[in-house]
């Protein structure tokens, strides 16, 4: 389905995390196809129902998690909100709030390092709510994240990542693209 929707890209990419990769999953391409998005999200919704109980709110980081979070929320009948970056920090805006003691599930399109979902977990904590876990379409974390809660994913996808100073020769020869939505300034 990733190839069919042109969501699996090959080349030289700088990920939102700052790491480099020779493959990139552009979930926006997958989600731009309603039929395929519904199929993927329906399957993920079933896994979520099986693994997480009593979800009051779905919280997604902008940009990538918004569509996935909304569709999962629609299918589960759960309120869905999102956090967006203000001055480089994920924040609740637009009147969104998380009531104290709410059970919150974080949903993202792709998890690699876990940075965005950990920021969302921080928002849940400062609102004195409960983090029930994480869900995503693509889990690229290779079990390297520092997450303490369970990740439910539709696809576990192992893609090699490299630090800028440890690029393989073949990758250094390919022009760089920066497709992610998080702007990291160094």
Question: Which residues are covered by each model-predicted region?
Answer:
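PRPP-dependent phosphoribosyltransferase catalytic core
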Residues: 1, 121-186
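Active-site-facing substrate-recognition patch
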Residues: 1-52, 183-186
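Short, well-ordered alpha-helices that flank and scaffold nucleotide-derived cofactor binding pockets
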Residues: 46, 50, 70, 74, ...
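Short amphipathic alpha-helix with an adjacent loop that forms part of the alpha/beta core around
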Residues: 50, 95-99, 165
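Short glycine-rich phosphate-binding loop at a beta-alpha junction
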Residues: 53-62
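Hydrophobic/aromatic beta-strand patches that form the interior of the parallel beta-sheet core
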Residues: 59, 81, 105, 132-135, ...
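Short, glycine/charge-rich flexible loops or terminal/linker lids adjacent to PRPP-binding catalytic cores
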Residues: 63, 68-105, 113-115
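A contiguous pocket-lining binding segment that forms or flanks enzyme active sites
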Residues: 95-135
